[in-house]
Regions:
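Short hydrophobic core segments
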Residues: 10-12, 41, 383, 462-478
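Glycine-rich FAD pyrophosphate-binding loop
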Residues: 26-55
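Dinucleotide-binding Rossmann-like beta1-alpha1 core, especially the glycine-rich loop
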Residues: 57-183, 205, 220-246
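A short, Lys/Arg-enriched amphipathic alpha-helix followed by its capping loop at the start of a domain
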Residues: 21-36, 369-375
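Beta1/beta-strand and adjacent pyrophosphate-binding region of the FAD-binding site
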Residues: 3-17, 39
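Central beta-strand plus flanking loop segment that forms part of the substrate or channel wall
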Residues: 493-508
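Active-site/ligand-binding neighborhood in enzyme catalytic cores
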Residues: 154-457, 461
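Conserved Rossmann-like nucleotide-cofactor binding loop
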Residues: 17, 21, 46, 476
């Protein structure tokens, strides 16, 4: 008798985390030597989690929010670049390749409230020849700071010079700043000729030269170097404040320039002043403080801390306690890491726009590719709770409610729209024994609050039905589905302290 030592793996939930896990596990050349089966249990009729989409009346795309991918999503694009060829779609057919499904999008507009009126604040980010998913090398924190400094120097030269006008009769403080800069050049950059330019022009040249010299040094910058950079940046910041700050409430262009410069310069000053590069946990060391509070601590202007640019950034990740916009909460280190990745690590374009719903462009291809690899899918299976073993060290049982009965052996989840496999906005009722009742009662099988009576409860047993478990359901479900795990202090801390935000979407 041949013993089968292969394991059974169950994946709970069909969102992006679960699909990424299924893809990675089945990307190993010998995965079928390890696992006898991999099965995904998903409530309702489709995959996607928050990224799900469906085709409603007249095949209109319905989804929870407008989804885009950022240009630094190397892992996600790598998956798509490998999944799409497995679909064998004919050339010229809808979404035949990943480049058909994702297009560069570089023009971004934020609504800005300025002096009681709304204005579009537009950004047209330059594109580059890099391809997301290839050559994924993340810059070091020091390299990011260098890119940040390079950015605001270029921004000042391109935008600020026409706005920055030094007064004909300068203040004593201005003259003192010139003297301090001349002394710095004499002692730190001997031989550099700064000439008869404005103070701002000279400051930009000195910062650029000093930082370039540091970047070429094999040993990297010292703490003293950081202090010198801080001094230079504070001189630049003070010059902007002297000559432009008082004008921001009367000139929209000046307001925008000052806010962008203040934000960039303050981030650089704050990172160096907090000695983040010398801390073992780097940016994580700042995560006990809200990003806006961190900026204020490092003397950013009030107008910058409250600007619509930051509001849009917080909105992007729903960074508010319980969704309350009066209680912003974005961990400073995480926020800075996000900004750096978004602005200085993108490939091709800052955003890539899906050419259909996220379900059509991401989760339908993943479903089809994973099925080809041998992954099983059980739709209409809602996880109810996980039970632990007697020693509390492993999962013993998984209780699952079957929501509906499929006619035949397997549920076909798609509808065809212009020769493209798409998820419908409601189940394919004709494939379900309870389909008519679900339709008549307008039941939403994806709702946490559904009143629908489940068909039956199934209990999966470890070592019989599964050996390994991937829990891919939203973190917010843990207190409801994994109560026994919460006796562990680490699980309890995660459930209590890592917040999620409820969101609502609508279409008109």
């Amino acid at each position: 008798m041949v013993m089968n030592n292969k394991k059974k793996l169950v994946i709970l939930g069909g969102g992006v985390g679960s699909m990424a896990a299924a893809w990675q596990l089945t990307s190993q050349p010998n995965w079928q030597d390890i696992y006898d089966s991999i099965t995904v249990y998903q409530m309702g009729w489709r995959l996607g989690g928050k990224g799900a989409s469906g085709r409603g009346d007249h095949a209109r795309i319905q989804e929870h929010g407008l989804h885009i991918w950022l240009g630094f999503y190397d892992n996600a694009f790598d998956v798509m670049q490998n999944a799409y060829p497995m679909l064998d779609r004919p050339p010229g057919s809808p979404l035949a390749t990943w480049t058909d499904a994702f297009k560069k999008h570089s023009y971004i507009v934020i609504a800005q409230n300025y002096n009681g009126k709304w204005y579009p604040w537009s950004f047209d980010f330059p594109e580059n020849s890099s391809v997301p998913g290839y050559g994924a090398i993340t810059p070091t924190l020091w390299q990011y700071i260098l890119r940040l400094i390079d950015f605001f120097i270029k921004h000042f030269r391109d935008t600020g010079m026409k706005l920055y006008v030094e007064r004909a009769i300068e203040s004593d403080e201005h003259q003192s700043a010139i003297a301090r800069l001349n002394h710095f050049v004499e002692t730190k950059l001997a031989g550099l000729e700064i000439g008869a330019k404005t103070l701002a022009q000279n400051l930009l040249l000195v910062i650029e030269t000093y930082v370039k010299n540091l970047s070429e040094r094999a040993s990297g910058p010292t703490e003293d170097d950081h202090q010198q950079i801080i001094w230079l940046l504070k001189e630049l910041h003070a010059s902007i404040e002297r000559h432009l700050k008082e004008k921001i409430n009367f000139d929209l262009e000046i307001y925008r320039f000052v806010v962008v410069m203040d934000l960039a310069v303050t981030i650089a000053i704050g990172l160096l002043r907090d000695r983040v590069l010398f801390r073992p946990d780097k940016l994580d060391s700042l995560d006990q403080e809200d990003f806006r509070e961190w900026l204020a601590r490092h003397e950013a202007f009030d107008e910058t801390v409250s600007c619509d640019l930051l509001r849009g950034f917080y909105d992007l990740v729903f960074a508010y306690h319980n969704g309350d916009t009066d209680r912003p909460s974005f961990a400073a280190g995480t926020a800075i890491r996000c900004l750096f990745r978004i602005l200085f690590s993108y490939k091709g374009a800052i955003f890539w726009k899906m050419q259909a719903g996220m379900g059509d462009t991401v989760f339908a291809p993943l479903y089809l590719a994973l099925k080809k690899r041998g992954v099983g899918f059980k739709f209409f299976h809602r996880v109810q709770r996980l039970g632990l073993s007697a020693d509390k060290k492993s999962i013993k049982t998984i209780c699952i409610a079957r929501q509906a009965t499929v006619n035949g052996e397997e549920y076909d989840p798609f509808v065809r729209v212009n020769d493209l496999d798409c998820w419908p906005a409601t189940p394919n009722y004709c494939q379900l024994q309870e389909g008519q009742a679900l339709q008549d009662q307008n039941i939403d099988l994806e709702s946490f609050y559904t009143t629908w009576k489940d068909v039956e409860e199934i209990t999966l047993q470890s070592e019989t039905d599964f050996d390994d478990v991937v829990f891919g359901i939203s973190l917010a479900s843990v207190p409801y589905l994994c109560r026994e795990l919460l006796t562990d202090p680490k699980w309890q801390a995660m459930a209590n302290k890592v917040e999620t935000t409820r969101t609502m979407a609508f279409q008109v």
